[in-house]
Amino acid sequence: MKIAAFDIGGTALKMGVVLPHGEIILTKSAEIIASDGDQILAEMKLFLAENTDVTGIAVSAPGYVNPKTGLITMGGAIRRFDNFNLKEWLEAETGLPVAIENDANCALLAEKWLGKGQDLDDFLCLTIGTGIGGGIFSNGALVRGGRFRAGEFGYMFSERPGAFRPGKYTLNETTTMLVLRRQYAQLTGRPLKEITGEEIFANYDAHDPISERLINEFYTGICTGLYNLIYLFDPTHIFIGGGITSRPTFITELKHHMASFGLRDTIIETATHKNQAGLLGAVYHFLQEENRHE
């Protein structure tokens, strides 16, 4: 059996062919312009036309995803996918079985299937990028919530909200790599497009005062979220993903800041699969669905 896997993002579509034991035998990616949902659908059709020997389709998608019906009630940055049933569309186009799951849940399922969560019953995954996402595995099961919105950790408040536009006090608005770059651009008077997270952290290592202040605030925001999650879910482990985790000293620095919060005994580590987590988690969900229907 070969499974076509898709990991849908607002700026890129990752595609692959994966075997049932988790070996990825082919990968491809496409840049997505302006979160264009129609372009995503066209790229998926093209990939499937190029790989006619696949026998199923596994999808990792952003937003609020009903994995039972395939309906995406809110597509995140991809507004074309609001109230769109991607599972039904793919099945009609190909005649193949399709399984779809939320992207953050797929990252968690990859960790459960072929990562550090294989023997764990209570753990969380937290992803730090342009936004903050997450997945919850509690009492031996993935937690999706009554409306498939569980794990939207980025909507937690990072500080006491003001009366006007309280959403600007959430982790998504205060503690992401995009926010860090915007803050640095504002303070230095440089264009945002010229600034990378790598540059800011390099300046932090060189003891640049602006970078030190911003990154200390960045870590404090992450620790605030972790503190809340630890006391909400009592996980034994939290695995963190996102480009920031490629920094060798990230976990050490995070734990240093976390010490003042009272870390307790929760183990915090980086996630295993990096950019392949979405593809692998989608395939694991597909295999679970196939087994359930047999």
Curated annotation (Swiss-Prot):
Its EC number is 2.7.1.85. It catalyses: D-cellobiose + ATP = 6-phospho-beta-D-glucosyl-(1->4)-D-glucose + ADP + H(+). The keyword Oxidoreductase does not apply. One of its GO terms (molecular function) is ATP binding. ATP binds at A5, F6, D7, I8, G9, G10, T11. InterPro entries: ATPase_NBD, ROK. Keywords: ATP-binding, Carbohydrate metabolism, Kinase, Nucleotide-binding, Transferase. It comes from the Bacteria. Belongs to the ROK (NagC/XylR) family. PANTHER family: BETA-GLUCOSIDE KINASE (PTHR18964:SF165), ROK (REPRESSOR, ORF, KINASE) FAMILY (PTHR18964). Catalyzes the ATP-dependent phosphorylation of cellobiose to produce cellobiose-6'-P. May have a dual role of kinase and transcriptional regulator of the cellobiose-PTS operon. This is Beta-glucoside kinase. It comes from Listeria innocua serovar 6a (strain ATCC BAA-680 / CLIP 11262).
